[in-house]
């Protein structure tokens, strides 16, 4: 999974650099979101500018970030 992460004082910007957010990528994305949450990141901006397709597992990963 390709992404960039920019941490600011009050938030982080997670830029997903993949065309598809599907069952191959979703578990890795969930893990990253959980890791960031455990590190104390409370506000996350998810930049999906390059993503062209999201399946149900991708949507589930996004919802993980909202918890």
Model-derived features with residue positions:
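Short beta-strand/loop segment at the start of cytosolic alpha/beta domains
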Residues: 1-14
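Flexible glycine-/small-residue-rich
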Residues: 16-18
């Amino acid at each position: 999974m390709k992404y960039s992460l920019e941490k600011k004082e009050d938030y982080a910007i997670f830029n997903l650099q993949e065309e598809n957010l599907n069952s191959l990528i979703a578990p890795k994305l969930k893990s990253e979101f959980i890791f960031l949450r455990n590190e104390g990141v409370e506000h996350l901006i998810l930049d999906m500018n390059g993503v062209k397709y999201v399946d149900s597992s991708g949507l589930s990963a996004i919802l993980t970030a909202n918890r």
